[in-house]
């Protein structure tokens, strides 16, 4: 099922980007 696969792929990408932004902000010291 390509729809479910693409959905999980998008979800994984969004989670990765969110984690990267959170880590970046933490290193800068805003959080």
UniProtKB/Swiss-Prot annotation:
Its membrane topology: Single-pass membrane protein
A molecular-function term among this protein's GO annotations: electron transporter, transferring electrons within cytochrome b6/f complex of photosystem II activity
Entry keyword Transcription regulation: no
Name of this chain's protein: Cytochrome b6-f complex subunit 6
Keyword Electron transport: yes
Cleavable signal peptide: none
Transmembrane annotation, as ranges: 4-24
InterPro entries: Cyt_b6/f_cplx_su6 (IPR007802)
Family affiliation: Belongs to the PetL family.
Subunit comment: The 4 large subunits of the cytochrome b6-f complex are cytochrome b6, subunit IV (17 kDa polypeptide, PetD), cytochrome f and the Rieske protein, while the 4 small subunits are PetG, PetL, PetM and PetN. The complex functions as a dimer.
Disulfide bonds, paired cysteine numbers: none
Record's keyword terms, sorted: Chloroplast, Electron transport, Membrane, Photosynthesis, Plastid, Thylakoid, Transmembrane, Transmembrane helix, Transport
Matches recorded under Pfam families: PetL
GO CC annotation terms, alphabetical: chloroplast thylakoid membrane; cytochrome b6f complex
Organism: Citrus sinensis (Sweet orange)
Subcellular location(s) per record: Plastid, Chloroplast thylakoid membrane
Any one GO biological process: photosynthesis
Function: Component of the cytochrome b6-f complex, which mediates electron transfer between photosystem II (PSII) and photosystem I (PSI), cyclic electron flow around PSI, and state transitions. PetL is important for photoautotrophic growth as well as for electron transfer efficiency and stability of the cytochrome b6-f complex.
